[in-house]
């Protein structure tokens, strides 16, 4: 992720309005996704065309297929924020050498992306780098083998659990699947997904809770991590005051 300055807001937004992108345009390279159809015609802050044009014209290397993605907001000051444009594969978030390589390659590609935007996207002629993200973003590393591991069926079919400690909308983003929370559908979050097998008095929350890949595409999101984190914090406090092991706490009391 990087952040630009020097953008002509008016020209940039005119181009966005003239050639709007929808979620159906997430159909190439690293951004190829399956939807359930309802998202396809919705507006998406997606940019791909200038990078493809730069590749076609030889401005960017022909094998560079990882550039393309979304932008956050454009301001009167000329700042264009949250350029989530660079996607890197085969980076092991538990390996320091991989992380170093990812930091270097990600920043190199960000500068190439800026070069393409300056040449091919209205409003970006005078754009320049404002700053990089503090570190490479990692979506998935180690996962807990929990007393209950959430499944794709749970997150796609409004899973319900007797030990639910919270709910989360049907928002799934990852592993080639995109379902946006537009219908009011939601899943429950089971307390057991934070409890490791064969280890007592330990709670694991955040993106490391138990689940398969598609479940992770939902539970990794920050707002879901906040819900689970709230439940874990309450459970930990109750366990301390009641001298009760985490696995023995009543989920109804936590909820």
Predicted features along the sequence, with ranges:
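Amphipathic, heptad-repeat alpha-helical segments used for oligomerization and assembly
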Residues: 209-224, 228
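Mobile, glycine/GP-rich and aromatic-enriched active-site lid/loop segments adjacent to catalytic centers
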Residues: 1-205, 209-215
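Non-catalytic terminal regions with compositionally biased, polar/charged low complexity
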Residues: 239-255
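Internal hydrophobic alpha-helix adjacent to the cofactor/substrate pocket in enzyme cavities
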Residues: 226-243
């Amino acid at each position: 992720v990087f952040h630009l300055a020097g953008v002509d807001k008016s020209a940039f937004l005119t181009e966005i309005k003239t050639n709007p992108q929808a979620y159906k345009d997430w159909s190439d390279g690293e951004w190829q996704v399956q939807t359930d159809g309802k998202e396809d015609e919705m507006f998406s802050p997606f940019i791909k065309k200038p990078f493809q044009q730069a590749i076609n014209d030889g401005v960017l290397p022909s094998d560079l297929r990882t550039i393309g993605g979304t932008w956050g907001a454009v301001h009167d000051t000329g700042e264009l924020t949250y350029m989530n444009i660079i996607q890197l594969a085969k980076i092991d978030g538990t390996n320091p050498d991989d992380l170093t390589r990812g930091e270097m390659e990600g920043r190199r590609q960000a500068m190439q992306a800026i070069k393409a935007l300056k040449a091919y996207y209205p409003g970006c002629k005078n754009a320049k780098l404002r700053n990089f993200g503090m570190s490479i973003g990692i979506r998935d590393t180690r996962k807990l083998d929990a007393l209950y591991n959430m499944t794709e069926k749970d997150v796609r079919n409004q899973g319900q659990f007797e030990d639910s400690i919270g709910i989360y909308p049907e928002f799934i983003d990852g592993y080639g699947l995109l379902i946006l929370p537009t219908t009011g559908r939601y899943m429950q979050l089971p307390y057991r997904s934070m409890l490791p097998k064969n280890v007592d008095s330990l709670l694991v929350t955040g993106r490391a809770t138990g689940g398969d890949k598609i479940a992770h595409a939902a539970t990794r999101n920050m707002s879901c991590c906040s819900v689970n984190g709230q439940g874990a914090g309450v459970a930990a406090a109750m366990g301390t005051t009641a001298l009760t092991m985490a696995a023995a706490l009543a989920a109804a009391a936590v909820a």
